[in-house]
Amino acid sequence: MKASQFFVSTLKEAPADAEVVSHKLMTRAGLIKKLGAGIYNYMPMGLRVIRKVEAIVREEMNRAGAVEVTMPVVQPAEYWQETGRFDKMGPELLRIRDRHGRDFVVQPTSEEVVTDIARQELRSYKQLPKNLYQIQTKFRDERRPRFGLMRGREFIMKDAYSFDRDQAAAKASYQVMAQAYRRIFDRFGLTYRAVAADSGAIGGDLSEEFQVIAATGEDAIVYCPQSDYAANMEKAEALPPQGPRPAASQALARTATPGKSTCADVAQLLGVPLQATVKSLVLATDETNESGEIVRSQVWLLLLRGDHDMNEIKVGKVPGLDAGFRFATVGEIEDHFGCRPGYLGPLNLRQPVRLVVDREVAVMADWICGANEVDFHMTGVNWGRDLPEPDVVADLRNVVAGDPSPDGKGTLAIERGIEVGHVFYLGTKYSRAMNATFLGEDGKPAFFEMGCYGIGITRLPAAAIEQNHDERGIIWPDAIAPFTVVVCPIGMDRSDEVRAAAEKLHADLLTAGVDVILDDRGERPGAMFADWELIGVPHRVVLSDRGLKEGQVEYQHRRDAAATKVASADIFAFIKDRIKV
């Protein structure tokens, strides 16, 4: 490929709405062009990256025994109505109606359609296992699309779905796919972690996220440097504190804290560690009638240490809160506590509440909490003396760095990541909802055991950039770079020797199967180098009249600070030896 034939379009400045590095660089490098909110044209340079990502994913899916299929982007609503997702999913599910008044959805995923394929085509256990995958456009009507391809509305995703005869076989299929994902991300040349994830309402422990490590990542990844333990923040368990609760050493006291409504402010005022304070979080659950009207509400009080944050996923596993909860209204709080938020606590309640205590708080002594009175807190609070021993103690918090690892092999550390893949054991959730069965070996119908497996095809290049960039631009891994090598001849329009040498190297690399581009645009060296550094091509060869007369060319990897002089006769072998695909 020659640059004069290709579409090379770079910008000196990023658009004003570009917030993260990947969005800025993908736009400046001419990889994407915004068409609307969360909707982008994949320009030729960007499409080359996407196609390389797709090729690796497709190779490994096929190697793992999955079979490619393509399902419609626009799907009849009746399939989604069978599972209830047509009504349950929020406005992120784009619903449309055709000229005949029939309802459709623009697919965000394809569980319903693939389950329909299975129930029509897979009739016997003899046809199992099967794994169908597609690489297809998806759409989610995000309320606030942002970060370019990281959180767009239209995107490309690889989604695979496995069908098995029983749970054991389904779990085996899950492991096959999890290993395929590891091969995929290894081939991409990215630093990543496979982390245990919460399985949601389905339960079980078969759910893993694949996170590309990046300081700008939205997700917190918890891991143990001393072992293989890794989980996302939702999943990571905060172990119960070891050892007995300390004995009470302070008297209970009502203490003035004028204008201090946060744990941090109270701790500073009283000259105590933040860890001596307890925060009160007030939730509510609702009981509804057949019409969906609320007939009864229950108020809950959660107690967490002042320096800890609530983990909503863990809270949602507490019996009584597992059917759904919300934060209590100000009116509900005032009715039960007689006080506005900021000074709440478990003492001196107006109406009873259901109390849930975090493991850490359950072993605290002489702690501080709100007095249910504006500008006052209670100090020297102790279990068994000032309050009954807590009935419900649970892990309610996010772990923090330095907590003991759940596997008992060290302490936890936390880093940031970007989720680019997820493998998930589904069980019979969709097959039961759609009555998708096959005849088992005993001649009786049985529901398919399913798994689903996703990779964000267009999200992955953005994640790669967040991990691999510098002040000059993108630094692509060889495997997914738009071009692996760029040949940059200086004065090609003025020197027959430079032109001939550049075209020969270009031709030789093409013949050897190397993805190379020859920059024949006639740009000044500085502008030419700046373009390819911004675009992020990993390997650059510079040919000049002076260098060729000395029998040398210059090679520079995108990560190198300076170029290396290489004998002209050796450059082909030199480059081939350094390409890592």
UniProtKB/Swiss-Prot annotation:
It is found in: Cytoplasm. One of its GO terms (biological process) is prolyl-tRNA aminoacylation. It holds the Pfam family HGTP_anticodon. GO terms for molecular function: aminoacyl-tRNA deacylase activity; ATP binding; proline-tRNA ligase activity. Its EC number is 6.1.1.15. It catalyses: tRNA(Pro) + L-proline + ATP = L-prolyl-tRNA(Pro) + AMP + diphosphate. Its main location: cytoplasm. The keyword Nucleotide-binding applies. Keywords: Aminoacyl-tRNA synthetase, ATP-binding, Cytoplasm, Ligase, Nucleotide-binding, Protein biosynthesis. The keyword Nucleotide-binding applies. One of its GO terms (cellular component) is cytosol. It is an enzyme of class 6 (ligase). Belongs to the class-II aminoacyl-tRNA synthetase family. ProS type 1 subfamily. Homodimer. NCBIfam families: PRK09194.1, proS_fam_II. Catalyzes the attachment of proline to tRNA(Pro) in a two-step reaction: proline is first activated by ATP to form Pro-AMP and then transferred to the acceptor end of tRNA(Pro). As ProRS can inadvertently accommodate and process non-cognate amino acids such as alanine and cysteine, to avoid such errors it has two additional distinct editing activities against alanine. One activity is designated as 'pretransfer' editing and involves the tRNA(Pro)-independent hydrolysis of activated Ala-AMP. Consists of three domains: the N-terminal catalytic domain, the editing domain and the C-terminal anticodon-binding domain. HAMAP family: Pro_tRNA_synth_type1. This is Proline--tRNA ligase. It comes from Paracidovorax citrulli (strain AAC00-1). The lineage of its organism: Bacteria, Pseudomonadati, Pseudomonadota, Betaproteobacteria, Burkholderiales.
